Every structure is written in structure tokens, then in C-alpha cells.
Amino acid sequence: PFTFDEWGKGNVNNNRQETKHLSRAVTYEGEALYRKEVNVPETFKGKRLFLHVERTKKTTVFVDGKKIGSCDNVQTPHRYDLTEFLFPGKHTLTISVDNSRRHYPAGVFNSHAFTEHTQTNWNGMLGKIFLEAVSDPFVESVKLVPEPEKKSVTVCLTIRNSYKPETARI
């Protein structure tokens, strides 16, 4: 995990005496590319492969130069299904992180996700970043819907099984 602030990369902030909000040493707004060579082991063959990026701004993911997809959600982790693009062997994984304001509605800029009073408009990736190999069937998503007046919770699951049909009762 890293940010431009931690690396000291970007435009030098000469107004470090500011006391009304956060005062960063450097600022950066725009696209940044992060590349890593990954070696997918034979043990991943036949499994679903997901890339997880826990905390970031807008991302676009590429495998061996081919665009896989984008996510601009700043509230939840980004998850990409790379199953069709990764197979055993070496691959180049590229993640574009772009904190440019053009990707977000104007109303977001005074929210905690961007203001210099709370966390700033940082660029980078924080938290866990990992590839996950999952066997079928697997839980794709979980949603909990609380109903306090009934003292109950409804659980909504999406279970995927892409290789063989199975019947289950929950």
C-alpha cells in the first residue's frame, strides 16, 4: 500500500504553515500507473481469479496491456474478475489510479472523500491489495438488510457456480 504523499512525489506544497486544515508536503492530482509482474501458479488453474484493491480512487485494470475494466467507487473496495485473462505463467498487471476531479460529481468535492479538512484528495492504494483464487461454487456477494422493528435480518446471497450445476437449499 502506498500513496504519492508517502513517496513524497507530486507538487511541493510551499504553504505548510496552514493550521485550518491538513497541510500536505506534496499534492498530486491525475492518473498514476502501477505495474507488477505476477506469476500465476499451476494450482490456480480452473479457479476464479479476483483482484482486490481495498481503498483507492478511480481504478482501471489491465492484464498484459488489455483493458479489463474500471471502477470509480470511493466508498467500497474494488474487485475485478480476472479469470478470463490470467492463466498459469507470467503476466503484467497494471492498475491506473486516477484521482482527477472530472471523474466525480461536483457535490463530492466538499465531502470527507476529498476535502483538505479530513483526508485530502490523495492518490494511491491503501489497505489490502491481492489476487484471490476461488473454487466453484463461491459466494459472490452478501447483503444484510436489518429490520429492527421485527428484530430480524434478511441475508441476500449471490452464489456463483460457473462449471457444474448444483442444487442447494438454504
Language-model regions: role of each:
Residues 61-63, 152-170:
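Beta-strand-rich binding/interaction modules
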Residues 1-15, 92, 96, 100-103:
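Accessory carbohydrate-binding/adhesion or oligomerization-edge regions at the termini
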Residues 18-21, 28-31, 80, 144, ...:
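Extracellular/oxidizing-compartment recognition motifs
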Residues 21-24, 170:
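Low-complexity, intrinsically disordered short segments enriched for Gly/Pro and polybasic residues
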Residues 14-15, 20, 113:
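Hydrophobic alpha-helical segments, principally membrane-spanning helices and signal/leader peptides
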Residues 145-151:
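Short, solvent-exposed loop/linker segments at the N-terminal edge
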Residues 24-138, 162-163:
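Accessory beta-strand-rich segments of carbohydrate-active enzymes
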